[in-house]
């Protein structure tokens, strides 16, 4: 029962475990949409749609559990590899337009410095993900490493809105895909935990529930902050059409 298939869903579509499998498919499609939307928004606005830390942490986590500990990702194994390749596209777009985001800083004066920065941060997160897997085991490392990725994705998106003061590089499509995937993933984990199947070896941890609460709170706050920022843009006459020039 740990590896439900589409045929199994069709046989008993109203069971709790079938629902968890449907939510897994929803999360897989949702996160993929999120990454594609980030790449599109980055090219459209010529400004990175994701901050340094969440992007580098995501790539490091996906590399670790797609290629080094693939067995630890369980029923997510193939999906994690797809996400890794999608994130490389996001990284390529980000590196192309990163100088526009770092203008006025020492790093922003050299694309080579920015490339080295991203490589160094990815390497640091990869080392951390490996250490976490060695410390806690692959299964728990996969989930807690992914928890860090989700926290950084949600907090990084909110942070970009607050610090940039405009909505270029931001998108409600990116937020919606992330929020739906995250919420659906949490419900899926709860179902699998209650039925004692793989994919949820950590929900008895108070820290896990704190993490779930803070991520959901950040995702809930994003559209409010986005609309407030849009109103500020409209009031100041900037709007979202004022793209920066590619350097």
From Swiss-Prot:
Its EC number is 4.2.3.-. GO terms for cellular component: membrane. It is a multi-pass membrane protein. GO terms for molecular function: lyase activity. It is found in: Membrane. GO terms for biological process: terpenoid biosynthetic process. The chain crosses the membrane at residues 49-69, 75-95, 114-134, 138-158, 171-191, 206-226. Keywords: Lyase, Membrane, Transmembrane, Transmembrane helix. Pathway: Secondary metabolite biosynthesis; terpenoid biosynthesis. Coiled coil: none annotated. The keyword Disulfide bond does not apply. The keyword Transmembrane applies. InterPro entries: PaxB-like (IPR039020). Belongs to the paxB family. In A.calidoustus, the austinoid gene cluster lies on a contiguous DNA region, while clusters from E.nidulans and P.brasilianum are split in their respective genomes. Genetic rearrangements provoked variability among the clusters and E.nidulans produces the least number of austionoid derivatives with the end products austinol and dehydroaustinol, while P.brasilianum can produce until acetoxydehydroaustin, and A.calidoustus produces the highest number of identified derivatives. Terpene cyclase; part of the gene cluster that mediates the biosynthesis of calidodehydroaustin, a fungal meroterpenoid. The first step of the pathway is the synthesis of 3,5-dimethylorsellinic acid by the polyketide synthase ausA. 3,5-dimethylorsellinic acid is then prenylated by the polyprenyl transferase ausN. Further epoxidation by the FAD-dependent monooxygenase ausM and cyclization by the probable terpene cyclase ausL lead to the formation of protoaustinoid A. This is Terpene cyclase ausL. The gene is ausL.
